[in-house]
Regions:
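Hydrophobic/aromatic residues within transmembrane alpha-helices
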Residues: 28, 38, 88, 114-116, ...
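Transmembrane alpha-helices of multi-pass small-molecule transport proteins
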Residues: 30-80, 107, 164-171, 185-206
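Glycine-/small-residue-enriched transmembrane alpha-helix faces in small-molecule transporters
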Residues: 1-41, 147-174, 194, 198
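Membrane-interface helix termini and inter-helical loops of multi-pass transporters
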Residues: 23-31, 90, 139-151, 201-217, ...
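C-terminal transmembrane-helix exit sites in multi-pass transporters
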Residues: 49, 54-61, 104-129
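Hydrophobic transmembrane alpha-helices of multi-pass small-molecule transport proteins
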Residues: 50, 71, 120-142, 162, ...
Length: 235
């Protein structure tokens, strides 16, 4: 298969899983899992999965310094993104949260312009203006409903999560270009998982879903979130 076609198909699958993920998380949060506990579930599962998968992969070279950088990047960037994302989606609607996720490329561009002197064109500025305008309109007009307990706060938190993830993407790309993909996943998820366990120990573990049977609807939805959006979409 042509590499470009393969890349496009991978992107389509990843975005589709992301869309299903938003609706699945909205179903689970906060009724079946508290947002902080949900973050811990995802990151611990993801870290365990990537370390297990790496056993069957070709070894990748990395220095101790790079591994520590990845660990800290995961503890701050990956965990920060996941924490704000799940907290935000528990308050707003899947449609609104998806709008803010789609703004990540805008924040990446803004960060690279401010800190890495990326070239600015009028077309790029127009695109940023349209994207931000749509987001502001969404925040200003989002009404409360059965799916959104606090739409305004949820939208703003999702906005913060998209900015945090953009920072994570820029830093990981600029500082760690020589690191293999599996090494990146292993150590960023490990750092994020450790941070999630620390935070969860402070706030407390809250997951009524653990009293459900394995084949109950909430548990099957959780397994989907853990296996597909959390693990497969990153590979």
């Amino acid at each position: 298969m042509n590499k470009q076609v393969e890349a496009n198909l991978s992107m389509i699958v990843s975005k589709a899983l992301g869309g299903f993920n938003m609706n699945a998380l909205k179903y689970l949060l906060p009724l079946w899992i508290a947002p902080v506990t949900g973050v811990t579930f995802r990151l611990v599962f993801g870290a365990a999965a990537f370390w297990l998968i790496d056993i069957f992969c070709k070894p990748e070279d990395s220095t101790t310094r790079q591994r520590w950088q990845l660990f800290l990047l995961g503890a701050l960037g990956m965990y920060g993104y996941m924490f704000f994302y799940l907290l935000g989606i528990s308050m707003t609607t899947p449609v609104s949260s998806s709008i803010f996720v789609s703004l990540e490329p805008i924040w990446v561009f803004v960060i690279t312009v401010l800190f890495y002197k990326e070239k600015v064109t009028w077309m790029k500025l127009l695109g940023i203006g349209l994207g931000l305008g749509g987001a502001i309109l969404c925040i200003a007009t989002q009404p409360g409903d059965d799916l959104a307990s606090n739409a305004m706060a949820g939208n703003l938190i999702c906005l913060v999560s998209s900015i945090v993830y953009a920072i994570y993407l820029v830093v990981s790309n600029r500082l760690l270009k020589g690191v293999g993909d599996m090494t990146l996943l292993k150590y960023t998820f490990l750092g994020a998982a450790v941070m999630s366990l620390i935070v969860n120990s402070i706030y407390g573990f809250e997951a009524p879903i653990m009293s459900m049977s394995l084949f109950s609807t909430p548990m099957l939805v959780l397994l989907f979130v853990l296996i597909f959006p959390t693990t497969i979409s990153y590979l």
